[in-house]
Amino acid sequence: EMMDLAIERTDHIHARVGSPQAAQVPDPRIGKGLGWTKRFEVWWDRIIEARAAEGRPFLTINPEFGPPPYQAINPHTEEPLADIWEICLWMSNRFRTRWADL
């Protein structure tokens, strides 16, 4: 019910994938991160379908993943575990492919 209300009121998707343990997953392309990505995509699909059904001409989406402290780092080297720019491009391309027919 709460998600239904949120979906009804959403007109922008800030497409960062998080989990109960972190504001963003270390890498949304693999492993548990991909699992969370797929879960978020179900919600995002519902938002996009709802706006399309209303006849809205567009919906804004930004695939933004932040640097540390949002981004997971190697505790020994303090280096990021993934390339944020590559993740954002991957997410953007995934959106374009997923929703190309809308």
Regions found by a protein language model. Give the residues of each.
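Histidine-acidic metal/acid-base catalytic patches
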Residues: E1-L102
